[in-house]
Design a protein with these regions (language model features):
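A glycine-centered loop/beta-turn motif at secondary-structure junctions
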Residues: 106-128, 136-137
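Conserved small/polar residues in nucleotide/adenosyl-binding loops
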Residues: 147-151
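Active-site glycine-centered loops adjacent to acidic/histidine catalytic or metal-binding residues
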Residues: 20, 84, 123
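Cysteine-nucleophile active-site neighborhood
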Residues: 1-53, 59, 68
Length: 151
């Protein structure tokens, strides 16, 4: 069901914000692959499965220049929380990376051919109360969605 819904939303050029499984779904549906188990297949050097609670940061990501994430935050790094065992392995051809963890995992992506299709591997919805930067991610999505709705 989710892949069919995503296909419809992308064809309709509606704003998309994919979080955790959402970034993974975006990547898989657009032709990318996933690590099914980071510890077995990738051997991370960052904490990607922090213990609860998830309202604090566990590692930083490096933000790629000339990307929507850089435009939203206007900084080079961001501290993020992390609680996943799957992640992007091979990036889908249509997606562009916006941030990487220090051990090289893609942590944020966007689809440049669409108005607003963004994915984050971390959980900004769990940390935004303690981090204005994560709140900015939602404010940006709401602003774009509102503009899209009014068009």
């Amino acid at each position: 069901m989710e892949p069919k819904l995503l296909k419809y939303v992308l064809e309709a050029n509606k704003p998309v914000l994919g979080i955790c499984r959402g970034i993974q779904l975006l990547n898989a549906c657009l032709g990318g692959t996933l690590y099914q188990d980071l510890d077995q297949q990738f051997h991370p050097t960052c904490i990607h499965r922090q213990p609860a609670p998830y309202d604090h940061s566990s590692h930083q990501v490096k933000i790629v220049e000339n990307t929507p994430l850089k435009d939203i935050l206007n900084q080079e790094t961001l501290m993020v929380n992390s609680c996943h065992h799957q992640a992007i392995c091979q990036l889908a051809p249509a997606l562009k990376p916006m941030a990487y963890s220090d051990d090289g995992l893609v942590e944020a992506v966007y689809l440049p051919d669409k108005k607003y299709v963004i994915g984050y591997q971390w959980h900004p919805e769990m940390i935004y109360k303690k981090s204005d930067n994560h709140l900015k991610l939602f404010k940006d999505f709401v602003a774009v969605s509102y503009t899209h709705l009014r068009a």
